[in-house]
Amino acid sequence: VITIGVKLTTVDRPRALAEANDNIWFSAGVHPHEAGNEADACNVDAFLSAADHPRCVAIGEAGLDYHYDYAPRDRQAESFRAQITAARELDLPIIVHAREADNDIADIIEDEMGKGTFRGVLHCFSSRPELARRAIDVGFYVSFSGILTFKSAAAIQQVAADSPEDRILVETDAPYLAPVPMRGKPNEPAYTSHTCLLYTSPSPRDVSR
């Protein structure tokens, strides 16, 4: 289980959970919603320091959110790039949040990849196929939440079906987005089995993998 950091000023909380539980790790980052409020949202050294812990396994949640626009877009982008730099230096994957910002997300990932390779995942994917394709082309993973099981998610289901099996991940986004048939309940890691079953049917994929 990975508990996600969304602010540097509160990274001690996911860190404490990871320190207290052998099956929990954490990420360190600034969510795009918080990019305008966090003084160190664009400070690479601050991310390097926050992630300097044996239980930290990723940078993020970072990225762009143009749906709510809680932070200025240029500030979101600057913070995203700073976190990519930290991820590259630490050789940790970056967890990417993308909402209504597909082109800018892909452009930044491709531009930063030209400065030096780094690893990452498009978290809780709900975007257009082109973003998945461009991210996969540079080595990213695409992670699907319980949204994949929703009746309204035909387009996302098609992205999953069209993506290489070795680039697909499944997640909870707990406590939100519980998959069918658990909708309405707090989400939990055990429920990822329902998302996996949707992904593997009707294709002959091995859900155990």
Question: Where do the protein language model's features map onto the residues?
Answer:
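Catalytic beta/alpha-barrel core
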Residues: G5, P93-R99, V121-F125, G146
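Glycine- and Gly-Pro-enriched alpha-helical subdomains that act as flexible
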Residues: I95-I109
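Active-site gating/metal-coordination segments in enzymes
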Residues: L8-P93, V138-Y141, G146-K151
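Short, well-ordered alpha-helical microsegments
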Residues: T10-D12, D102-A106, R128-A132, A153
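Active-site-adjacent C-terminal substructures of enzyme catalytic domains
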Residues: V57, E112-S201
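Single conserved hydrophobic/aromatic residue that forms the stacking wall/gate
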Residues: Y199-R209
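Short, glycine/acidic-enriched loop or turn micro-motifs at the edges of active sites
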Residues: P32, L64, E100, S126, ...
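N-terminal binding-site loop/beta-alpha segment at the start of enzyme catalytic domains
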Residues: V1-L8
